[in-house]
Amino acid sequence: FNWSRTAGANIDLSPGFEHKVLETLPDGSQRVQTWTGTIERVTPGVVSIPSEDDYLLKDRAAFEELYLPKMQYFEDRVNVGYFKSLNDKRDWDLPLGIFLGSVMGKIRDMCTVTGMSYLIYDEDEELFADIVNAYADMQYKCIKQILETGAKFDFGHFWEDICYKNGPLISPELFDELTAEHYKRRTDLCKEYGIDIVSLDCDGVVEKLLPTWVNNGVNTMFPIEIGVWGDQFYPARQKFGNKVLGVGGMDKTAFRRDKAAVDAELERMKRLASEGGFIPCPDHRLMPGSKFELVQYYAEEVKKCL
């Protein structure tokens, strides 16, 4: 699978906020407003994740005046002509997915992890629910419009980075309360149009959110980061059985060690792949210190696992 080969609508804030430099600080760093309305600290020439300085989505007034108008559905969010032409261009042998959007991860992008926490606990859950519902309703309408064009897809794919190395960035109970209906609504729509593989991209330790996803139609985990916390796919298989599929789950730190470490990882991948419904691969980028000859060796040997 090439999981980047998905097609979708414009389901972001539209129009986005103006991307502009608000202030240049004495150390040369800049406070920059992004298209999501967050204020980031950026150092020119430094390629890294910028720190979050501030955000606009702080209360109901900001939501209703600044954000809600940008979350509205309109037909031009979908390039209908492009999707109608997709079936005529299906001369490739790779699967094509429909992008199913994000229920909460993109909202976390809009208000930062800190801001999301304050919105829930210092403002009120009703406001946060209104934000989730407004954004989700627009996305659903776009996805439905795409499928109604007759374009054929092999899988659906969510993006939902809402976990980190210690688990979810939000209470699993509240996450389920706010998001379950929106996952089910979209996965039911996928089933209606013959799409039975629905994957979800979430980094970090996802175990506590799996019940929400699996019980509402998501059946494929990605990228199954190993990180510092270890394997997550085998426990998921033990709990949910073969209805949970996986893409990822390879411990890429083996590339920094030796051939024996890669062989051990290949053996672990082979056991998982032998059950079916699992495609091994490393997550994201390879780490500094990785040995290219070990990557080459893995790339050849992993084919034997599939």
Give residue spans per PLM region.
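Short amphipathic beta-strand/extended segments with alternating polar/hydrophobic composition
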Residues: I39-D53
